[in-house]
Amino acid sequence: MSIPTVIAFSGNIGAGKSTLLRGLEAAGYEVVPEDFSRWGQLFEMALEDPNRWKFSSQLKIMLIQSEIQRAAKKSDNRVVVLERTTECVLDFCNVAMEQGQILPAEHDMLVQIWEKVNVPVDAKIFLNTPPEKCMERIAFRGRAFERDIPVEYLSSLHSKFTRDPDYIMSGLESKEVVLANAIELIEKIVSRNVR
């Protein structure tokens, strides 16, 4: 049994990750999208009262993402494509601390937990879409819990996500071009990662 190549796409809210992952799944890749339903009530509570619940919700999301990354390493498929990583959760935590939604001590604790539970992926690809374009896409898809996101929040996240990806792809082209570019990049990564 060979070990799969685990590749994660990160990017801002509204960057085009979910659309891209649906295309990759249709192309035959094993895909694990974000599943908001697994985050449960804590996620909803954090949206309503972030100063009270942001730490707890981010901890839960980090633990779930760690489980996803661990399971991906055990897949029988040649490639597993994930939506986000535990590092992305830390990026959300960094912004939450900057906005006063979690305390520095809570942030330090999340980093310590991340150091214990993180399961590294083989490649992180950042889907680079400017915050203003993300705002347009967020408005178009109409998710209730996203309707009040300010562009400043997206700009803060964007600056965090751009810090340490292995690869950067533009999210501005048509979904067909983004998909073709992603498949080409995935296959290049897999060919370098044959075990």
Swiss-Prot record:
A Pfam family that this protein carries is dNK
EC number(s) from the headed UniProt entry: 2.7.1.-
Q: Which domain of life is it from?
A: Viruses
Could you give a GO molecular-function term held by this entry?
deoxynucleoside kinase activity
Q: Which InterPro entries has this protein been placed in?
A: DCK/DGK, Deoxyribonucleoside_kinase, DNK_dom, P-loop_NTPase
EC class, as a word, reads transferase
Record flagged with keyword Transferase: yes
What keywords were assigned to this record?
Kinase, Transferase
Instruction: Tell me which PANTHER family the record gives.
Output: DEOXYADENOSINE KINASE (PTHR10513:SF35), DEOXYNUCLEOSIDE KINASE (PTHR10513)
Protein name per UniProt: Putative deoxynucleoside kinase
Q: Which organism is it from?
A: Frog virus 3 (isolate Goorha)
